[in-house]
Amino acid sequence: MGFRLAHLAACVARAAASSSRLRGPRPAASALVAPLLASPWEPSGGGQPHWLVPSRGHVGHSHHHHHGEEVGGEASERIFRLGLAADVVLTVGKAVTGYLSGSTAIAADAAHSLSDIVLSGVALLSYKAAKAPRDKEHPYGHGKFESLGALGISSMLLVTAGGIAWHAFDVLQGVMSSAPDIIGNVSHAHHSHGSSGHHHGIDLEHPILALSVTAFAISVKEGLYWITKRAGEKEGSGLMKANAWHHRSDAISSVVALLGVGGSILGVPYLDPLAGLVVSGMILKAGVHTGYESVLELVDAAVDPSLLQPIKETILQVDGVKGCHRLRGRKAGTSLYLDVHIEVYPFLSVSAAHDIGETVRHQIQKSHNQVAEVFIHIGSLQPLNQNAL
């Protein structure tokens, strides 16, 4: 009896093995249930919906995005350092030239360049602070330090403009009240009284020195303007753009100083203090403009619509997005923070709608490097909006 039972068990085992080979491997339970759970909007051929992206795609892109910011930040920092070094050289050159030639305009420009050293230092420190990584106390980063630095620069520009205007007006008043035959001597004696008691008339033996240094300053500052301007536009840095226009204002003020030197050499001394007044006016304008832009960023003013329109076009080009509204943004230094409402088909699954939102985020940060973060609210397409789309 035991032999028969063992023989029967062996036969059953061989039959089961043979049946398994004929049928092949049994499908997994998830494979049987998946077709029943598929969204009616997903393709039936088994392919991935064309609006979906792998979840790792956003993480990988985020790493690449920050790496690009790091490389661009190093290049921008070098530009700030270059501007600081140039300001030191120009300040020394203008101060020596103003001392030798006795030109009020060049002396005023030297004082302006001295303030430029401080301003360039503040700009560099503000930029480095703004590029510090996020931490627990600053979850949105340190971008506002750029705006604070620009506001500090504007305040110092206003003070510098006031000091130069006061000195130039004082000299001009002395020139206008002097007798015509001694107008040159009196004006420069008055200027020397404000310069620690040293008398500096217009030294006609050094006109070439005065003109050469001024022309050199114009060339250097104009070159710094273009370098800084292009870097600021590429990175979207308001601080760099303001610093670029500051370099441009320095170049123009040097042109005015050049006119003042020429007027003094030609025997028209009142052009010298008038040039100083024009320089102070240009510095005043730069300070007001920089301060206004900085305050707008600090109070989270609305971003220019011309900056948001390309981003909206990028959103509407994403497959699955059927509408876009309430696109808003605020700036924090070089970074732009956005929030937007998008509309999708009402019968999509939650995961499909989420993947569309991730695709929108991916495309925005891919096409617009200045965007640091996007908050996306996903809603269903309303029947009233279908005809409009």
From Swiss-Prot:
Residues 1-81, 126-148, 228-250, 297-389 are cytoplasmic. The chain crosses the membrane at residues 82-102, 105-125, 149-169, 207-227, 251-271, 276-296. Pfam families: Cation_efflux, ZT_dimer. It is a multi-pass membrane protein. GO terms for cellular component: membrane; vacuolar membrane. Residues 103-104, 170-206, 272-275 are vacuolar. It is found in: Vacuole membrane. InterPro entries: Cation_efflux, Cation_efflux_CTD, Cation_efflux_CTD_sf, Cation_efflux_TMD_sf, CDF_Transporter. Belongs to the cation diffusion facilitator (CDF) transporter (TC 2.A.4) family. SLC30A subfamily. This is Metal tolerance protein 2.
